[in-house]
From Swiss-Prot:
Gene3D superfamilies: 3.30.1380.10
Sorted UniProt keywords: Disulfide bond, Hydrolase, Metal-binding, Metalloprotease, Periplasm, Protease, Signal, Zinc
Annotated disulfide bonds: C44-C265, C187-C235, C216-C223
Binding site for Zn(2+) 1: H110, H113, D120, H211
Gene Ontology MF: a single term: metal ion binding
EC nos: 3.4.24.-
Name of the protein in question: Penicillin-insensitive murein endopeptidase
Amino acid sequence: MNKTAIALLALLASSASLAATPWQKITQPVPGSAQSIGSFSNGCIVGADTLPIQSEHYQVMRTDQRRYFGHPDLVMFIQRLSSQVSNLSLGTVLIGDMGMPAGGRFNGGHASHQTGLDVDIFLQLPKTRWTSAQLLRPQALDLVSRDGKHVVPTLWKPEIFSLIKLAAQDKDVTRIFVNPAIKQQLCLDAGTDRDWLRKVRPWFQHRAHMHVRLRCPADSLECEDQPLPPPGDGCGAELQSWFEPPKPGTTKPEKKTPPPLPPSCQALLDEHVI
């Protein structure tokens, strides 16, 4: 499938959830032992943790949207990564969307982030902590050139390279989505230590943030993991294909309705949403 068709599918997956979803009516995590259920784009979570808003190592953006819930493994990953970044004096980690209290489908902006195992992290590491006003209305820093073929040299910093590499080296991380131009720059900067690049995957948009995804927890028996990324650093023909013009004759895919929920997620909705 060519890149234009994939882009249209991604857009449809996101726009299909623009209408309000019942998951928004669940305002607190569902009690129980932590269980990620279903797939990243069609699932839910029981026993989600709340990411502490106050931390000396990170700051949480858009707290008014209450998207700072996730599996305990995700909370621990954020704390672990931000502590590493702080110890290296790289700056403050800026945390974007995680998931809703019970996971589930958003009303827009995300097709995934449904099982408590995804988090968006800004590709900025401010040395001075942001104000409350800045956090509520964050200004994204677009690192990619207008033509989408490379990063903006004056905006690309070694600290951002280190942030992405640290995240990719974490044992619980399976994928990190970034813009193809950012992946390309990582490939150029990586040197001989390249194993971690396998986890960094080019994807549409993602010009100012990285989307980090964790593996399914071992005790979440209903969680559906993705296949591992292809072997290698992903810096060859696959990456270059993202910069090729779309093939002629690309047709817009039919709009698809969301798939049925996993039975456990449907039961959760039936119990907690009137």
